Amino acid sequence: MKNMIKAASLGLIILSSSMMANAAEAAQKIGYINTAQVFQALPQREVVLQKMQEEFKDKAAELQAIQADAKTKIEKLKRDGQLMGQDEVEKLRIEIGQLDSKYKIKAQALEQASARREAEEKQKLFKVIQDAVKKVAEKEGYDIVLDTSSMQYGKPEHNLSEKVIKAIK
């Protein structure tokens, strides 16, 4: 009976020590980054912004020209409307309406094209960030890296943002 109790105790000790070993193995090193901070620090971000402004400069200038033309015609209608004949006033109003429609269509197309290009470029930049995060996480021995937007608290020593920024630059 005593031997049975000793054997059971020994079995429990071995079992509990193996459970502790498994628990220690299961502990993972978790870090975090502030993706927005890293994104703002990207040197490529400014280059991409300038490239996009250059790409859409002509279309923006065209919109400004349409807007200026419409403004000129509206001012002419206000200034000379009383002196103009009914047909001329009606013709000018139609032209203003057409310019307004043209402006709205072109502005919407520019907005959509700009948003699409911005999304494409952001996707490329986030890929750069992901690669840098992976590189830093592997180098530092982190199993998981979260974004600050998905967590409540993290010890400052597990913040990898600055290390990721340095890896990108």
UniProtKB/Swiss-Prot annotation:
Signal peptide range: 1-23
Protein name per UniProt: Chaperone protein Skp
Subcellular location: Periplasm
Gene name of the record: skp
Family: Belongs to the Skp family.
InterPro entries, per database record: Chaperone_Skp, Skp_dom_sf
Record Pfam families: OmpH (PF03938)
Function: Molecular chaperone that interacts specifically with outer membrane proteins, thus maintaining the solubility of early folding intermediates during passage through the periplasm.
Lineage: Bacteria, Pseudomonadati, Pseudomonadota, Gammaproteobacteria, Vibrionales
GO annotation terms (biological process): chaperone-mediated protein folding; protein stabilization
Binding partners and assembly: Homotrimer.
Keyword Signal among UniProt keywords: yes
Record's keyword annotation contains Magnesium: no
Taxonomic source organism: Vibrio cholerae serotype O1 (strain ATCC 39315 / El Tor Inaba N16961)
Source organism superkingdom: Bacteria
GO molecular function: unfolded protein binding
Main location: periplasm
Keywords: Chaperone, Periplasm, Signal
Gene Ontology, cellular component aspect: periplasmic space
